[in-house]
A protein has these predicted regions:
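Short glycine-rich substrate-engagement loop in P-loop NTPases that contacts/grips substrate
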Residues: 47-48
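Extended, compositionally biased accessory segments flanking or bridging domains
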Residues: 9-15
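C-terminal accessory helical subdomains adjacent to catalytic cores in phosphodiester-
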Residues: 1-4, 15-41, 52-171
Length: 171
């Protein structure tokens, strides 16, 4: 019986990064027996409206193939909620609703504390190689996204969140 994992993501950059990370682990640690399903909900608000239906659909598909859905991971940017008195999603309630569908306690909430651009900045050498640029002394900006936009602008380029991150990760 093949093991399946469903990973909910909320944006284009995650759609590029998570498969690359999993491919890295598969090729380096012999993790071929697990099948991953990525579902881009295209925004945090769609966790409420789409996640339950997609989960049920995935469970049915996995059962048809004699597999088992072991884990559901909900990845989201936590910075959206940092200063909100009334956050748009009650994550505990969503987790409970998803657990009711799976009949198990295998729902993992995975808030991203830093943006994916912050991860990309941790490989400044690779980023500069991609741009064919020299490593800057410092980058202004309050977060990784602003810093990468500034770096691209220094070299007369525009940073496109999904597209450029895919090319950067591929290198």
């Amino acid at each position: 019986m093949r093991t399946h994992i469903l990973l909910f993501i909320e944006g284009e950059t995650e759609e590029v990064l998570f498969p690359a990370i999993i491919q890295y682990y598969r090729s380096n640690y012999n993790c071929q027996e697990v099948e991953f399903h990525y579902k881009n909900l295209r925004g945090i608000g769609n966790y409420k409206s789409k996640a339950k239906g997609i989960l049920q659909e995935t469970i049915n598909k996995v059962k048809k193939g004699n597999g088992i859905l072991k884990v559901v991971i909900c990845s989201y940017d936590s910075d959206v909620f940092d200063y909100s008195h009334n956050p748009p999603i009650d994550w505990k309630l969503l987790k409970k609703k998803l657990e009711d569908i799976t009949k198990a306690k295998n729902i993992v909430l995975m808030p991203s504390i830093q943006s994916i651009e912050d991860w990309l900045l941790s490989d400044m050498e690779g980023l500069c190689n991609y741009l064919k640029a020299k490593k800057p002394r410092n980058l202004p900006g309050k977060n990784g996204h602003e810093k990468i936009k500034h770096l691209f602008k220094l070299y007369n380029k525009v940073y496109y969140k999904g597209y450029d991150s895919e090319n950067i990760v591929a290198r």
